[in-house]
Amino acid sequence: MKQEDTKQKILDKALELFSSRGYDAVSVGEIAQAVGIKAPSLYNHFPSKQAIFDALVESVAAQYTRDTDQISIHVQNAPQDIPVFTAITEDALYEKVRQIFEYSLHNETIRRFRRMMTIEQFRSPELSRLYTERYITRVALSHGKEE
């Protein structure tokens, strides 16, 4: 297995485990076992469990941004969406909302990431901020409310 393939498999298995059991309940050994490698080999790819978690957050956040940009919703910069939403028809708005909902519901990586963030927001101030930005503030702003 190539190093990049192994690295991605580590991230995939870590997300699977973190989203079902939480970060603290998962050991590096369990991640390595799920990948099919020995724990010391995992350290050739990531220096720590926290580094795996950080890479996972960065990777999935980037994927989410790329994917949502394809439907012209700029999740990192809501002001970019003002022209989109001021001139949108009701049917087009419905279609964008449907696409986002379908994507969030049926994309396994995004679904697991959202579940993991829901659990881990209480452990990490950075994740709490990211969770609040991505899921709370955006919903509040879409309803015309501010925190």
Model-derived regions: residue spans:
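Short alpha-helical functional segments enriched in proximate histidine and acidic residues
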Residues: L17, Q63, D67, Y103, ...
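An amphipathic alpha-helix signature
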Residues: L11, Y94, R98, A140-E147
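Amphipathic alpha-helical packing segments from all-alpha helical-bundle domains
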Residues: H106, R111-T118, F122-E147
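Short, basic, alpha-helical segments at the C-terminal edge of helix-turn-helix-like DNA-binding modules
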Residues: E58-Y64, I71-S72
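N-terminal intrinsically disordered/low-complexity leader segments
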Residues: M1-D5, V75-N77
